Curated annotation (Swiss-Prot):
Family designation: Belongs to the SecB family.
Organism annotation: Afipia carboxidovorans (strain ATCC 49405 / DSM 1227 / KCTC 32145 / OM5)
GO MF annotation list: unfolded protein binding
Compartments, record wording: Cytoplasm
GO terms (BP aspect): protein folding; protein tetramerization; protein transport
Top-level taxonomic group: Bacteria
Name used for this protein in its record: Protein-export protein SecB
Subunit-level organization: Homotetramer, a dimer of dimers. One homotetramer interacts with 1 SecA dimer.
Role, per record: One of the proteins required for the normal export of preproteins out of the cell cytoplasm. It is a molecular chaperone that binds to a subset of precursor proteins, maintaining them in a translocation-competent state. It also specifically binds to its receptor SecA.
Keywords: Chaperone, Cytoplasm, Protein transport, Translocation, Transport
UniProt feature coiled coil, ranges: none
One of the record's GO cellular component terms: cytoplasm
Pfam families associated with the record: SecB
């Protein structure tokens, strides 16, 4: 097989994504006003959720991708609970063109991690004495585009005139 044949066979290979491991990096659940906060059952709390994605190249084709989830439930001016979860996985990604690698890592990998992180959040809130917090599905394509637009805007603002 010649070099050109090997190169074209490599280019034709389908993208491959392997999950090597996944894990909780950090988990915090605070219930600062318990047991009084647990008696708020009739009132609907104001719940805010923030989800961010980060990735680190571990060398070669291996990437650590982390979902950072922060949630807070408030009733009037009191915190019912505060939750922070950093859930990560190590992925081996092969045969993805370089120009598609960043969106692939930042969209497909978090999409695979999310159901596991969602279950951890639901269990933590349930174990904290509250109804399980079931996170809505996340549009990781939209989140990626939003983050890219924010980065472009920050770069524009930091350029000298």
């Amino acid at each position: 097989m010649t070099d050109t044949t090997a190169a074209s066979a490599e280019a034709a290979a389908p993208p491959q994504l392997g999950i090597l491991t996944q894990y909780i990096k950090d988990l915090s659940f605070e219930n600062p006003n318990a047991p009084a906060s647990l008696s708020q059952q009739g009132k609907q709390p104001d719940i805010t959720i923030q989800i961010n994605v980060g990735a680190t190249n571990l060398g070669g084709t291996d990437f650590e991708v982390m979902l950072a989830i922060e949630g807070k439930a408030m009733a009037e001016d009191k915190v019912l609970f505060a939750l922070e979860l950093a859930y990560a996985g190590v992925f081996r990604i092969e045969n993805v063109p370089q120009d598609s690698l960043h969106p692939f890592v930042m969209i497909e990998c978090p999409r695979l991690l999310f159901p596991f992180a969602r279950e951890i959040v639901a269990s933590a809130t349930r174990n904290g004495g509250f109804p399980p917090l079931m996170l809505d599905p996340v549009d990781f394509v939209g989140l990626y585009r939003q983050n890219m637009a924010r980065q472009a805007e920050q770069q524009q603002q930091s350029k000298p005139n």
